[in-house]
From Swiss-Prot:
Residues 49-73, 437-475 are annotated as: Disordered. This is Squamosa promoter-binding-like protein 12. PROSITE patterns: ZF_SBP. The gene is SPL12. Induction: Negatively regulated by microRNAs miR156b and miR156h. The lineage of its organism: Eukaryota, Viridiplantae, Streptophyta, Embryophyta, Tracheophyta. Zn(2+) 1 binds at residues 180, 185, 202, 205.
């Protein structure tokens, strides 16, 4: 039973004792006592007017009683005025009985009760009546098992039986000592490593080549941490075959071929399986194109094409791939057929169903010609100066050169291809200018006759090396 009262008086102050909740003052004896009320089912508000001629003061009392199964709380307030009429108003509040809520799983009576009318309730003796924990409840905490809330120490020490059972199970599991599951092994694993405790195998039997577990010959796999039969185990390794196969499959995964355009090799198929062209980038100003395959088509007939070279070009050496001969012709005069410009090299050159694509990278709009290396690989170079704009005399001279399938046409070759009847292979002939002496044709390997003075072409040296690159500068 805890009770307290407050007294408001206009003339004298009110003194409050925290240890003893009974107020003391000049009007202490005039305070009405709190009357306990029976437990109603609702909130009861009672107001009464009392006539008083000489009453000046107000009282406020409240009482709260906590028991095992019920909660009683009453609030009494009395306000008096010093007027002549002497009206006195008194309020009495009684809280509804709080029903207990089950807090434990075993069905024991536990309750959580709330009384919103009383300002504060003391949980235990010796604590202040009014709690200082703002915003938090200072009552009915840690209630379990139907204990009396008046003793906070007893309430805090009691726990639910379900929690006790769980703690007991954990303690039993920790106290149980695990042993090795190999037959005949009674090694206590309580002080062993966590790995061996978890898999219930001692360190000696985890590495043994053969153990008996449940009457069967087994061996412990240190990779998958399981016992396997001897047939499933690799005797040379410490892992089972399935684990090893998965490991090898991950290590031997086929890796995709990396294609780089620096100074590496890019292999692409331009024809079929019998023809393959390897392209190298970054090794020359415009790259080198080398054909490694020779067509094996048997009888294509005489495939002829007409070449027309500009006047500043000089006869070049024959490119000697196997069964591949093509030469360029220095011919003055008008161009017989249309000239192929640098942007036409991106097209496809047909060779009886097989196509090859000549790559053009940064070719100078003026000209790009083909010069032969010692190994026969054509080299794309840039014309350093193209100063000739003079027109030569009209001349209708054509050069026919036999090209076998699989050869790569020079980039500035003018292809006006016509398929004729099969002819016997002959050496490539180059027509001379009509104005030069000695008329007729000259064979490969002979030095070409000099041109006349009007169209004398002087070869210039390439800045990169000391050999002539096959370009001419006209005077």
């Amino acid at each position: 039973m805890a009770s307290f009262g407050m007294n408001w008086n206009q003339k004298s102050p009110v003194f409050w004792d925290w240890e003893n909740p009974a107020p003391f003052g000049p009007n202490t004896m005039e305070n009405p006592k709190s009357i306990p009320h029976p437990e109603p089912r609702g909130v009861v508000v009672a107001a009464a007017n009392h006539g008083s001629t000489n009453s000046s003061g107000g009282t406020f009392t409240s009482s709260s009683e906590l028991a095992n199964g019920s909660s009683k709380s009453s609030l009494s307030a009395s306000f008096d005025s010093s007027s002549k009429l002497g009206n006195s108003l008194e309020f009495r509040f009684a809280s509804v009985k709080g029903h207990g809520k089950n807090m434990c799983k075993d069905g024991e009576a536990g309750r959580v009760e709330d009384s919103g009318t009383s300002p504060a309730v003391a949980v235990s003796h010796g604590e202040p009546v009014i709690g200082l924990k703002l915003g938090k409840r200072t009552y009915f905490e840690n209630v379990c098992g139907g204990q009396n809330v008046k003793s906070s120490s007893a309430a805090s020490g009691v726990t639910c039986p379900s929690t006790v059972v769980k703690k007991m199970k954990v303690s039993q599991q920790s106290t149980q000592s695990s042993y090795c599951q190999v037959e005949g092994c009674k090694v206590d694993l309580s002080s062993a490593r966590e790995y061996h405790r978890k898999h219930k195998v001692c360190e000696a039997h985890s590495k043994a080549p053969k153990v008996i577990v449940s009457g069967l010959e087994r061996r412990f796999c240190q990779q998958c941490s399981r016992f396997h039969g001897l047939a499933e185990f690799d005797q040379k390794k410490k892992s089972c075959r399935r684990r090893l196969s998965d490991h090898n499959a991950r290590r031997r995964k086929p890796q995709q071929e990396a294609i780089s355009f620096g100074s590496s090799r890019l292999a692409t198929m331009f024809y079929d399986a019998r023809q393959q062209t390897d392209i190298y980038f970054g090794q020359s100003p415009f790259g080198q194109v080398r054909s490694n395959a020779i067509s094996s088509c048997d009888n294509l007939g005489g495939f002829k094409f007409t070449e027309a070279k500009l006047p500043w070009m000089k006869p070049m050496k024959t490119i000697g791939l196997e069964d591949l001969n093509f030469s360029t012709l220095q011919m003055p005069g008008n161009v017989v057929s249309h000239t192929v410009h640098h942007h036409d090299f991106d097209g496809l050159i047909p060779f009886k169903g097989n196509t090859t694509k000549v790559l053009n990278q940064g070719v100078d709009p003026a000209c790009a010609v083909v010069s032969s290396n010692s190994n026969g690989a054509p080299d794309l170079r840039r014309a350093l100066s193209l100063l000739s704009s003079d027109s030569w005399g009209p001349a209708d001279v054509q050069a026919g050169s036999q090209v076998h399938p699989g050869g790569v046409m020079p980039p500035l070759a003018v292809a006006a291809a016509t398929v004729t009847a099969p002819t016997n292979p002959v050496s490539v002939m180059h027509a001379l200018h009509p104005s030069t002496g000695g008329g007729g044709f000259w064979q490969d390997g002979d030095d070409p006759p000099p041109l006349d003075h009007a169209s004398q072409a002087q070869a210039f040296m390439h800045p990169g090396n000391g050999s002539s690159s096959g370009y001419g500068h006209l005077h």
